[in-house]
């Protein structure tokens, strides 16, 4: 069984908003800016308090809702984060970053179909959204929808042709479909870009064996063992 590599753990796109405006205590942007400053210092709880103050003054302030959602997301308060992201989308439906982050929470909660729905809408709004294409590919592969995974990984490689992990995962998808020549080609590209990823060596060994190329498979397995001893799983 070949191995997928997930190279960002459902990346949280912060994209914190700092609104321009007045500086008085009755100005929601004042509290929003204070929250952003506290957030940048790692004072997430204090930042949440400031964003809530901004929203008490202006309940439909999109920037404060988004920043509050991100703060909740960082703290792992996913239910609260979902509510805030949904509020942002009510105010601004065509926000691909919010859709991406919402999908990330759904994926963490094993709600893969909901995650895919959010990410598909994100890439519809922003076709060159590489991170969203990658997680779509990864999630489709997990669901064994390899044609869809291949499509998404190729879109990533259009923007990031030297991404070793995406080449690896595309190779895995081709292997699962029995397209061994294409799989070997992608895995070799991955190895050329980053020779030290042990899992890619293991995947290449697997593809070679399925192809009947035992000598090449044995060589990759030896390299795989050497790399795992050094701790190079997905570097």
Regions found by a protein language model. Name each.
Residues 27-63, 67-77:
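Alpha-helical segment of the N-proximal tetratricopeptide repeat
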Residues 22-26:
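Bacterial signal peptide processing site
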Residues 40-53, 75-87, 94-97, 108-121, ...:
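Structural signature of tandem alpha-helical TPR/SEL1-like repeats
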Residues 57, 91, 125, 159, ...:
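Structural marker of alpha-solenoid helical repeat scaffolds
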């Amino acid at each position: 069984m070949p191995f997928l590599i997930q190279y960002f753990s459902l990346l949280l796109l912060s994209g914190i908003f700092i609104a321009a405006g007045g500086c008085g205590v009755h100005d929601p942007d004042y509290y929003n800016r204070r929250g952003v400053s506290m957030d940048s210092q790692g004072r997430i709880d204090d930042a949440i308090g400031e964003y809530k103050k901004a929203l008490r003054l202006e309940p439909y302030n999109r920037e404060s809702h988004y920043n509050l959602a991100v703060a909740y997301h960082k703290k792992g308060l996913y239910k609260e984060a979902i509510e805030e992201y949904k509020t942002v989308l009510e105010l601004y439906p065509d926000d691909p970053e919010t859709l991406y982050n919402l999908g990330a929470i759904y994926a963490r909660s094993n709600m893969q179909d909901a995650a895919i729905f959010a990410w598909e809408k994100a890439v519809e709004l922003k076709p060159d959204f590489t991170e969203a294409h990658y997680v779509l590919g990864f999630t489709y592969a997990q669901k064994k929808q390899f044609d869809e995974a291949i499509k998404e990984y190729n879109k990533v490689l259009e923007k990031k042709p030297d991404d070793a992990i995406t080449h690896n995962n595309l190779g895995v998808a081709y292997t699962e479909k029995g397209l061994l020549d294409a799989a070997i080609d992608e895995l070799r590209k991955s190895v050329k870009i980053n020779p030290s990823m042990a899992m890619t060596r293991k995947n290449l060994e697997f593809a070679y064996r399925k192809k009947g190329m035992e000598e090449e498979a044995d060589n990759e397995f030896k390299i795989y063992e050497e790399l795992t001893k050094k701790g190079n799983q997905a570097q």
